[in-house]
Structure formats: structure tokens, C-alpha cells
Amino acid sequence: SDWSSDVCSSDLGADLYLELLYRQLEKIEKLRLNPIPSHKVRTPNFPDIPELSVNYLVTPEARKVAGKMLTRARNSIEIDRLTESLETCFGEADTKSMRAINFHRMRTLAGELGVFKIEFYVDSGLIEFAMNASLEVKEMLVDNLDDVYKRDLSVTSTGLEVLALANVGPEVSMTQAVNALRRISDALPSFIKFM
């Protein structure tokens, strides 16, 4: 009879364990990001997509190939590798080319996090990252950051807002957006990134 009670309690333990595991997986599923392709991230402040300069890549073919590779990068690692390859072959990028690289880096990082629109408000310094995500997901993106960075980031009904420097040029705003997106991405728990 002791044996039958052990079997029952072990079955009960297994059932409880599976139920607990299922509930945890449901919670994790709610935290899933909805990544989108980088070329679908809208950037109203940039009506034209910045391109690599003639001074950096002389031939139209080279600019076209590199531009396509930047546009088609699936993640920020691919952008970083491409940038390293360009620097190895052609040296450090000039200002115009760096702007194009940062533009694609910004959209790629945004797409990885599910941000579908990035808007800059130059007068106030606000950068808005619009995303289709639950409040829980948006809060998780902020909660994982170091306190130093949390101060400048807030959750809104439409996504996240970063308070950056006001009245700066587009390159500075873009760099601030890239830095904010990179910090958010780097602070994410790895199980969220790979779901």
C-alpha cells in the first residue's frame, strides 16, 4: 500500500509540475516581441533613405550591392559585420556613409524589438518608438535597463519614448536612437530574444 501512495503522490507531483511549467510558459509567451523586417520600420523624419557616398564607394555597383546588404540585414550583428567588412576594404566611412549605416542600424535594431515607427521631435528632444506590444512587454523592455538609462525612457500607450538632446541635427538624433535601442536590446533576457 505504501507503494500505491508513492505512485499517486509522484503522479500528482508530476501533474503539478507540468501545470506550473505550462503557466510559466504562458507568461513567457505573453512577453514575446513581435519583430518586423527593418525595411518596414517607418521613419517619417527621413523621407529619403540615406545612401552611401560616392566618395566612400566610387562605383555605382559597389554602392548598390552594399546598400542592398544594409537594407536586407536581418539583425544588428549582420549590420556590424557588414560595417567591419566595409571598413576593412574601404577604410573608415565618411560622414554621409556613416549616416546611411546608422540609419540602417537604427531600423534593424528597431525591427528586432518590434518597433514599427521611429519619430524624432527635435524641439523637445523626444524620440518615439511606436510598437504593437502589450503594456507588460513595454514595461519589461524598460525594467531590464540600468537605472541610469531608465530615467530617460518612459512607457507610453503607443510604445516607448526616449528623452534625448533637443535641437540637434539628424545625425545626433539618429545616434541617440541607435544607442537607446542597443541598450534596450542588450538588456533583454536571452530567452526573450530567441523566442
Report each predicted region and the residues it spans.
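Accessory helical-bundle/CTD segments and flexible terminal tails appended to RecA-like ATPase motors
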Residues: S5-M195
